[in-house]
Amino acid sequence: MTNDVIQQQIEYYRARANEYEQWFYRTGRYDRGKELNQRWFDELAIVKTALHQIEPVKHILELACGTGIWTQELLQIGQQITAIDAVSEVIEINQQKLQSPKVNYQQWDLFTWEPYQQYDLVFFSFWLSHVPPIRLNSFLQKVSHSVRAGGEIFIIDSRFEPTSTAKDHILKNDESIYQVRKLNDGQKFQIVKIFYEPDELDNELVSAHFKAEVKITENYFIYAYGKKIT
């Protein structure tokens, strides 16, 4: 079942490419009204501030780069970015949006991707929660191999909060790692979605040879900054 759901995730983000940013910018089905939207953006500002505490680096690897929401932030930190995603549609949006010679785009399924070099900083946002538990260790080991000795990692993901998703989605606080997601046109896809607690994420990062500080915002986000332990 895991392989089928992973393929569904890829198809989901392919079909969602042109509406993905509605979630981030709280428009359309994700508009929760002035108060909740402002809460979302205030908490995003906290995460962005933490990201920009990182000193400038030469080369960044961004995994699951998506439509460029965070790639544009990373351009302020890195001299060069390698941006990887499994979905050509989001890579195209990212590329057209940024039009930066500093970004090298590559299309890879992150479950078959293998690092061929090391980077100063590895970044991924809203991706780890889509990694099935059976694939988590191998993925994080590959991340570790892609970070140079003493290099850095920054991760952003979702907390369990019902108002984070579309108004016609219902987040269930149960033990299932699977969720059904719906697009604007009514198409439905099954995906993996796991909400980590800070201690859980910290333990996984320690196992992958990172010493990290994991933090949460009040409602919406969990994020981690760490360095590779040699």
Give the ranges of each region predicted by the language model.
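A conserved beta-strand element that flanks and buttresses the S-adenosyl-L-methionine
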Residues: 123
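A short glycine-rich, Lys/Arg-flanked "PGG" loop and its adjoining helix->strand segment in the class I
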Residues: 137-149
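Class I (Rossmann-like) S-adenosyl-L-methionine-dependent methyltransferase catalytic domain
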Residues: 1-55, 61-63, 67-117, 131, ...
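Short catalytic micro-motifs in class I SAM-dependent methyltransferases
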Residues: 126-127
